[in-house]
Amino acid sequence: MDKIIKSIAQSGAFRAYVLDSTETVALAQEKHNTLSSSTVALGRTLIANQILAANQKGDSKITVKVIGDSSFGHIISVADTKGHVKGYIQNTGVDIKKTATGEVLVGPFMGNGHFVTIIDYGTGNPYTSTTPLITGEIGEDFAYYLTESEQTPSAIGLNVLLDENDKVKVAGGFMVQVLPEASEEEIARYEKRLQEMPAISHLLASKNHVDALLEAIYGDEPYKRLSEEPLSFQCDCSRERFEAALMTLPKADLQAMIDEDKGAEIVCQFCGTKYQFNESDLEAIINDKA
């Protein structure tokens, strides 16, 4: 089961979140049938949103949009505070690797664009923030957002490793944030440790990558685990929700669906679930509008 572990240095100087998001990203790949680069880009976005959502309280919903002007198109993710996340990528078929190493490429094909977050507190006044894409690798773009928009200097590592068949092998990440109690000496020490950390891809390849991430972040520094919470890819779409959407259409449009298509098929963008509405269903909706 996927999880996020929240922790804090015993000194109170900084906190860290580490995530295992393997099942989340694997299910997203399965639902959207994404190729290698699209899988990694979508996966990193989902993990970034899992981190953001873990920072929220109540029934907030957090939307992350990675909007580039190149190969991937838009990547959209929505998460809640209960560990659920969903998402999709416009172009599922990007499959670009380095010839020599087989490394899956993302950043060079993201293009120019923005990292957009929308936090809906349920009050009718969502908070929206937009920062430019810095590298297109998503992790660095997320870190820049946290520093610029939330005024919280953060170190971020996100990645998705694929097997020889380009299926998700492991996915996860971390966030480290300096807290107000940190002294200049402590900040310098942690910055040095983060600079010396192995690459996120190397840590994820460890047998127990969650423990490997924590060990790399804290070293010999004592720390406390604050919580361990489950994570999952879960869509909240339903037939009732799409029926309500059909109810908003003019009667003429609904009648055209009956006359021309003998019904309607609606596909959820976030999870690919198909909902069928036959002629009788559409006629009932028309009658309800009368």
UniProtKB/Swiss-Prot annotation:
Superkingdom: Bacteria
GO cellular component, one term: cytoplasm
PTM field: Under oxidizing conditions two disulfide bonds are formed involving the reactive cysteines. Under reducing conditions zinc is bound to the reactive cysteines and the protein is inactive.
Membrane-traversing stretches: none
InterPro entries: Heat_shock_Hsp33, Heat_shock_Hsp33_C, Heat_shock_Hsp33_N
Disulfide topology: 235-237, 268-271
Compartments, record wording: Cytoplasm
Disulfide bond among keywords: yes
Pfam families the record matches: HSP33
Keyword terms, alphabetized: Chaperone, Cytoplasm, Disulfide bond, Redox-active center, Zinc
Homology family: Belongs to the HSP33 family.
NCBIfam families the UniProt entry points to: PRK00114.1
Protein name: 33 kDa chaperonin
Recorded name of the encoding gene: hslO
